[in-house]
Swiss-Prot record:
It holds the Pfam family Ephrin_rec_like. Glycans are attached at N415, N479. The gene is Epha1. This is Ephrin type-A receptor 1. Residues 27-548 are extracellular. GO terms for molecular function: ATP binding; ephrin receptor activity; fibronectin binding; protein kinase activity; protein kinase binding; transmembrane-ephrin receptor activity. The modification Phosphotyrosine is found at Y600, Y606, Y782. Belongs to the protein kinase superfamily. Tyr protein kinase family. Ephrin receptor subfamily. The modification Phosphoserine is found at S907, S911.
Length: 977
């Protein structure tokens, strides 16, 4: 009987021209593929004559071998088997895949419509494992069924004629194989089928490079993921912070999954293009450590002569100061001060000079002054010695930052040589002496007493004893004396003395005298000192009589008795008040001790959340509560202002937070969690919980009422109305509250100005504990599985890995500081969340707000350290803010504003070099929008008009604050640069 189909060759041609499916991503290792066979397959047929048959078709000059079977015309049950040759599996893969390409004819397409009796459209796949080839014995009972193969699409004669026959592809897997090889068998129960190709293969994870680590070819395991350790590429090391050797996991499908850890290029190398290796830094570039992403160009006056440098060495004559890193430019000592000059007033000398012409590339120049006293003229070689302790320099003789110094205590008739040296932090590293300028001075003949004061030693009705500070001549033969000029309303006279001391006699009692003094030298008199007034004593009074003495004594005794009575009365009243205060303190302490003795817990530990809340909060009677106006609302509840009147207590204003009955269960849980957390604290800077209502709907949380509301809105309404000291005090309160939270192992996770409340005394309190969680310990972490994250306030590690710690709250506190100092501005302006995340990863940090004190901005930057271990703790932040509050002068230094760092606005399509299209847009970006009307009034409507503005122009426009002028002019200079 003919076993081939009608039109079989045409059908095969259509099948051979059909497209093959794309390959899988995993690497596939083929064990057998009939489509690539170079000769007849020679598979075992059973029965050999009437069952399956092998056909050959030429395609592009290459023979293609396949099997077909169509026993439809035979009638009755069909039992045709086709067995493959032995397929060697080896010792590697425990799972293999079988891919079949075949076609099946639709039974309804045969004559008669319903199809011949026994016609089917499926066939069966079997397999048998063996360690060797068993020959031509079929051994049907030893085969195990894999699956019944059904066609997704069958064809008809009409499909064949129109060329629309499509190829079916079936893929199945055989797992847990243990023998060295196997056979495949195909059982046809009565379908008209063509087996075009059979491919047997296994999958493996291909050799790859990930995170600068090499991972070899890896076979999947019998089940689950296989962990594979990688090897760092050449010149790469395990990344800082990684938990060990980089690892990836090979999945059963041959794909690499779940990378853990990575490698980084070692110092002196950077990632090559495509991140497939490490290349050495070229000459002139360096990479100092693994925290630096790329090779950096050598700073000014430093060189890297070889590739792969980790540091750039300074050029000859240039140095780095101690503590300066390799990223700092090399500098040199300054040149000598210029134009050293002096002026004298008596024996007081004023030295002045100008800064060095060459500063050496540094701004930390300090000056020191040396003084030598010489006999004769120093230039003529006269002997000189250092000036004695009597010579004083104001403000100091060394460490001067200004270019002037006052010298006092010099001797008349003496020659002095003053040397002014200019130094910076690298001067000590240079072998040569510091550059200096010298000046020789002759103090002349006269001594001035203009800066001295006459002092009264003793006075009597007819005598005055006076003294003053004088000098003794050092040169031989130099005689000094003093002339006094004394006068009153009736007379005046001059008196000569040899010592700086005089006793004036024969004066009038109870009379004022004006006295001044000057020195007399062989070259003439010096100038007079300022006038001083002295008054003699009144004449001695007569003696008291006996009666007067008795009256005085009686009055004294009466006064003493009165004072004793007042003292006894006040002492008793103070004792009663102290006892009352002690009783009150004892009561308060007992109440607080009961509160603080409660363990800090999370609501998660309770099966009934309502019961957990009541363990830390008082259940209030709704009758005690008066609900007033709505002060806030959200999707699942409202916040009201109301009044609470507890039994036997005065009525007080409270805030009432409600939860709608229709809220999801998760919100109900978090609602009670927030009450539980607040109830565990009694801190002046954490919102105080008054009680809860859980036994009636809606559920309510009652807290103290904060008159000024949320901090961000409060600051916007009072822009520039609060002094820096007030802002620091508010930040100190927030830091104190957060220190209390973190000290008890809580992480807030949503610290922002909108969640800080302000009362009428400007006291800030931390609130909104909906996202707050309890950590296992102080250094613990909390890992969330989902939910929204406030990107602009959240630390980078919390965004990337959803891991929250106290350090991530410190990052958020730095953003709150920025909000406070900018009076409620939005962090990062109009940047999108994606831009914010990328900018932070690139090292961008918020610029200082307008007029931000430099110490506060430094504190912000410390909070924004990328490495969370480098961020300060809240206790350190609290101490630092307390120190700033006690030293208000430190807040006068304003943080430098970099004009190149501005917050991007939506439109950046200005003219070339000016990334703003309007003046108002530019002023907003540098936080100077308050001056928009000033610019409009001055007719400055375009950005080109502002490029030539000067400080005088700004003053005429009404912009007079120096800090604001500096910010505007720096931004304009940034456009020009």
């Amino acid at each position: 009987m003919e076993r081939r189909w009608p039109l079989g060759l045409a059908l095969l041609l259509l099948l051979l021209c059909a497209p093959l499916p794309p390959g899988a991503r995993a690497e596939e290792v083929t064990l057998m593929d009939t489509s690539t066979a170079q000769g007849e397959l020679g598979w075992l047929l059973d029965p050999p004559e009437t069952g399956w048959s092998e056909v050959q078709q030429m395609l592009n000059g290459t023979p293609l071998y396949m099997y077909q079977d169509c026993p439809i015309q035979e009638g009755g049950d069909t039992d045709h088997w086709l067995r493959s040759n032995w397929i060697y599996r080896g010792e590697e893969a425990s799972r293999i895949y079988v891919e079949l390409q075949f076609t099946v004819r639709d039974c309804k397409s045969f004559p008669g419509g319903a199809g011949p009796l026994g016609c089917k459209e499926t066939f069966n796949l079997f397999y048998m494992e063996s360690d060797q080839d068993v020959g031509i014995q079929l051994r049907r009972p030893l085969f195990q069924k894999v699956t019944t193969v059904a066609a997704d699409q069958s064809f008809t004669i009409r499909d064949l004629a129109s060329g629309s026959v499509k190829l079916n592809v079936e893929r199945c897997s055989l797992g847990h194989l243990t023998r060295r090889g196997l056979y495949l068998a195909f059982h046809n129960p009565g379908s008209c089928v063509a087996l075009v190709s059979v491919r047997v293969f296994y999958q493996r994870c291909a050799e790859t490079v990930h995170g600068l680590a090499h991972f070899p070819d890896t076979l999947p395991g019998p089940g689950g993921l296989v962990e594979v350790a990688g090897t760092c590429l050449s010149h790469a090391q395990i990344s800082l912070g990684s938990s060990g050797t980089p690892r990836m996991h090979c999945s059963p499908d041959g794909e690499w999954l779940v990378p853990v850890g990575q490698c980084q290029c070692e110092p002196g190398y950077e990632e090559s293009s495509g991140n497939v290796g490490c290349t050495a830094c070229p000459t002139g570039f360096y990479r100092v450590d693994m925290n630096t992403l790329r090779c950096l160009k050598c700073p000014q006056h430093s060189i890297a002569e070889s590739e792969g440098s980790t540091i750039c060495t300074c050029e000859n004559g240039h140095y780095r100061a101690p503590g300066e890193g390799p990223q700092v430019a090399c500098t040199r000592p300054p040149s000598a001060p210029q134009n050293l000059s002096f002026s004298t007033s008596g024996t007081q000398l004023s030295l002045r000079w100008e800064p060095p012409r060459d500063t050496g590339g540094r701004h930390d120049i300090r000056y020191s002054v040396e003084c030598l006293q010489c006999r004769g003229i120093a230039q003529d070689g006269g002997p000189c010695q250092p000036c004695g302790k009597g010579v004083h320099f104001s403000p100091a003789a060394s460490g001067l930052t200004t270019s002037t110094v006052q010298v006092q205590g010099l001797e008349p008739y003496a020659n002095y040589t003053f040397t002014v040296k200019s130094q910076n932090r690298v001067s000590g590293l240079d072998s040569s002496s510091p550059s200096s300028a010298s000046l020789s001075i002759n103090m002349g003949h006269a001594e001035s007493l203009s800066g001295l004061s006459l002092k009264l030693v003793k006075k009597e009705p007819r005598q005055l004893e006076l003294t003053w500070a004088g000098s003794r001549p050092r040169n031989p033969g130099g005689n000094l004396s003093y002339e006094l000029h004394v006068l009153n309303q009736d007379e005046e006279w001059h008196q000569m003395v040899l010592e700086p001391r005089v006793l004036l006699t024969k004066l009038q009692p109870d009379t004022t005298y004006i006295v001044r003094v000057r020195t007399l030298t062989p070259l003439g008199p010096g100038p007079f000192s300022p006038d001083h007034e002295f008054r003699t004593s009144p004449p001695v009074s007569r003696s008291l009589t006996g009666g007067e003495i008795v009256a005085v004594i009686f009055g004294l005794l009466l006064g003493i008795a009165l004072l004793i009575g007042i003292y006894v009365f006040r002492s008793r009243r103070g004792q009663r008040q102290r006892q009352q205060r002690q009783r009150e303190r004892t009561t308060n302490v007992d109440r607080e001790d009961k509160l603080w003795l409660k363990p800090y817990v999370d609501l998660q530990a309770y099966e009934d959340p309502a019961q957990g809340a009541l363990d830390f909060a008082q259940e209030l009677d709704p009758a005690w509560l008066i609900v007033d106006t709505v002060i806030g609302e959200g999707e699942f509840g409202e916040v009201y202002r109301g009044a609470l009147r507890l039994p036997s207590q005065d009525c007080k204003t409270v805030a009432i937070k409600t939860l709608k009955d229709t809220s999801p269960d998760g919100y109900w849980w978090n609602f009670l969690r927030e009450a539980t957390i607040m109830g565990q604290f009694n801190h002046p800077h954490i919102l105080r919980l008054e009680g809860v209502i859980t036994k009636r709907k809606p559920i309510m949380i009652i807290t103290e009422f904060m008159e000024n509301g949320a901090l961000d809105a409060f600051l916007k309404e009072r822009e520039d109305q609060l002094a820096p000291g007030q802002l620091v005090a508010m930040l100190l309160g927030i830091a104190s509250g957060m220190n209390c939270l973190s000290g008890h192992n809580y992480v807030h996770r949503d610290l922002a100005a909108r969640n800080i409340l302000v009362n009428q005394n400007l006291c800030c309190k931390v609130s909104d504990f909906g996202l707050t969680r309890l950590l296992d310990d102080f250094d613990g972490t909390y890992e969330t599985q989902g939910g929204k994250i406030p990107i602009r306030w959240t630390a980078p590690e919390a965004i990337a890995h959803r891991i929250f710690t106290t350090a991530s709250d410190v990052w958020s506190f730095g953003i709150v500081m920025w909000e406070v100092l900018s009076f409620g501005d939005k962090p990062y302006g109009e940047m999108s969340n994606q831009e914010v995340m990328k900018s932070i990863e690139d090292g961008y940090r918020l610029p200082p707000p307008v007029d931000c004190p430099a110490p506060l901005y430094e504190l912000m930057k410390n909070c924004w350290a990328y490495d969370r271990a480098r961020r300060p703790h809240f206790l350190q932040l609290q101490a630092h803010l307390e120190q700033l509050l006690t030293d208000p002068h430190s807040l006068r230094t304003i943080a430098n504003f970099d004009p190149r760092v501005t917050l991007r606005l939506p439109s950046l399509s200005g003219s070339d070099g000016i990334p703003y299209r309007s003046v108002s847009e530019w002023l907003e970006s540098i936080r100077m929008k308050r001056y928009i009307l000033h610019f409009r009034s001055a007719g400055l409507d375009t950005m080109e008009c502002v490029l030539e503005l000067t400080a005088e122009d700004l003053t005429q426009m009404g912009i007079t604050l120096p800090g604001h002028q500096k910010r505007i002019l720096c931004s304009i200079q940034g456009f020009k640069d």
